[in-house]
């Protein structure tokens, strides 16, 4: 699963 930290 992609990390949300990459977007935020």
Curated annotation (Swiss-Prot):
Biological process GO terms, please? neuropeptide signaling pathway
Q: Does the keyword Hydrolase apply?
A: no
The places in or outside the cell where this protein is found are:
Secreted
* Major location (coarse): secreted
Keyword terms:
Amidation, Hormone, Neuropeptide, Secreted
Residues bearing the modification Phenylalanine amide: 8
An example GO CC term for this entry is: extracellular region
Q: Which residues cross the membrane?
A: none
Sum up the protein's function in the record's words.
Neuropeptide. May be involved in the regulation of adult diapause.
> What family, per the record?
Belongs to the NPY family.
Q: What name appears for this protein in its UniProt entry?
A: Neuropeptide NPF-2
């Amino acid at each position: 699963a992609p990390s949300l930290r990459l977007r935020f």
